A protein has these predicted regions:
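Residues within well-ordered alpha-helices
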Residues: 94-95, 105, 178, 202, ...
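TOPRIM metal-binding catalytic domain and adjacent DNA-binding surface shared by DnaG-type primases
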Residues: 1-32, 43-135, 156, 161-167, ...
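Conserved catalytic cores of soluble enzyme domains
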Residues: 8, 35-37, 44, 164-167, ...
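Alpha-helical scaffold elements adjacent to nucleotide-binding pockets in ATP/GTP-utilizing enzyme cores
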Residues: 30, 228-232, 249
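Short, surface-exposed amphipathic charged segments that create phosphate/polyanion-binding patches used
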Residues: 205-209, 251-264
Length: 285
């Protein structure tokens, strides 16, 4: 039942007072002052005070409050241990096969902590929050289907030592395979979002007072997500740029021959985003 407090305009139908008591739209009344009332039948005495009444002329079937099952206990996952097991299960040949499929070197996948789920026959990518703790596992099946293990929370792909101070900007890409491409190109301070609009809260904590380059996918949703993130980071980060690669995403660009110098040149030639107007002017064209 959804209880509504009585007021001066709609006082308690039992005691006539404008406060303390409550009613429901289906005719029940919880009166805080009266134990018995003509024309009403008491159906529950509350230990914290008051009596719930129903009209005495209702259906002869005894009214019972709707059963509310207790919520199931929250299951706690030891993601660190799960990640370790999945990582150990990934044989060199399995990781090499994925590296060839993605067009990156095995070392980049190793840096991401890529593992293998034998039962589901899927590659695994750990997701982290801003303090470097594993909060979930993203799966990638042999067919390319992407999903997360039950209980996972969205986090970032890739993590680095935040205590290490560098003049290099932190690169933020979309998804684990784009981060793999950036790592393969030598951009070691790179992380990936779980989606084009995911992990904003984590990034706001991670990127505070840092130089940041958002590497957007070149489609509409990718650019819109990058712009949305940029709006959230203005005033939090030090310097901010949004880079849109000439191909669909940075991994495709890498596979078509882009080098670290190519990416660095694009970043250098991209105007810094200092206000909302500059962010909004960015397009996927």
């Amino acid at each position: 039942m959804s209880w509504v407090r009585v007021n001066k305009n709609k006082p308690c139908p039992i005691c006539g007072k404008p406060d303390w008591c409550s009613v429901t739209v289906d005719g029940a009344c919880r009166c805080m002052r009266v134990q018995e009332a003509p024309g009403w039948k008491a159906i529950k005495q509350h230990v914290d005070g008051g009596v719930t009444f129903r009209p005495a002329n209702e259906d002869t079937n005894e009214y019972k409050e709707r059963y509310r099952p207790k919520p199931p206990p929250v299951r706690l996952y030891d993601w660190r241990n799960i990640q370790d097991e999945l990582y150990q299960a990934s044989e060199a040949a399995t990781r090499k096969q994925l590296a060839e499929e993605l067009g990156v070197r095995v070392i980049a996948l190793t840096a991401l902590g890529v593992g293998w789920h034998e039962k589901k026959e899927a590659h695994t990518f750990p997701m982290y929050h801003e303090q470097g703790v594993v909060v979930g596992i993203r799966m990638r099946s042999r067919s390319g289907k992407k999903y997360a293990l039950p209980g996972s929370k969205d986090g970032l792909f890739g993590i680095f030592d935040m205590s290490y101070k560098s003049t290099d900007p932190i690169l933020v890409a979309e998804g684990p395979t784009d981060v793999a491409a950036l790592l393969d190109l030598g951009f070691h301070f790179s992380v990936g979002r779980p989606s084009c609009r995911g992990a904003v809260g984590i990034l706001k904590k991670l990127l505070k007072c840092r130089d940041v380059v958002i590497i957007s996918d070149a489609d509409g949703p990718g650019v819109d997500g990058a712009k949305s993130l940029a709006h959230s980071l203005i005033g939090i980060v030090n310097r901010l740029k949004i880079v849109v690669p000439p191909e669909n995403d940075v991994r495709e660009w890498r596979n078509k021959g882009a080098t670290r110098d190519d990416v660095q040149l694009l970043i250098s030639n991209t105007q810094e985003c200092k206000d909302a107007g500059q962010i909004q002017s960015i397009t996927s064209e």
